[in-house]
Amino acid sequence: MKSRATVICAHGGHILFVRKDRSKWSLPGGKVEPGESLAAAALRELREETGLDASEPLYILEFDAGNVRHHVFEVAVANAGDARPLNEIAAVAWYAYGAASELDATAATKSIVSSFLRRL
């Protein structure tokens, strides 16, 4: 099973979503590099995909989708307005907690966000 570090970046009642070209919305994240901790991978992927820096990622849940295990971290950022699409990401957007279920997002993303919201 592949491991993926997935990030829920929550700010002011909104969650940050990313989208690759011609893809559905998802949460920032990606593969864990050899020798890299899950938390370090989460922070690196957030920075590489959105330009945002976070610290103190909180491990909140694990979610299996097919052959991928999402290790989900919650982070807070001070510079939320600076989010921008970088590298393979075509768009970034903040959506209100309640709007997440209506997004054209992957099934895994919707399930992870739903689990996160139940914790609040």
Where are these regions (language model features)?
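A short local loop/turn or secondary-structure capping micro-motif enriched for an aromatic residue
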Residues: K24-L27, V92
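The catalytic Nudix box helix
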Residues: L27-I60
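Structural detector for helix-capping/boundary residues
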Residues: G13, G30, R44, Y95-G98
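Conserved N-terminal beta-strand and adjoining loop/helix that marks the start
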Residues: M1-I15
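Short, charged/polar surface micro-motifs in flexible loops or helix N-caps
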Residues: G13-I15, R22-K24, E33, G66-V68, ...
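Active-site-adjacent beta-strand/loop module that shapes the phosphate/pyrophosphate-binding cleft
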Residues: F63-A99, A108-L120
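Residue-level detector of high-confidence beta-strand sites
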Residues: V18, I60-E62
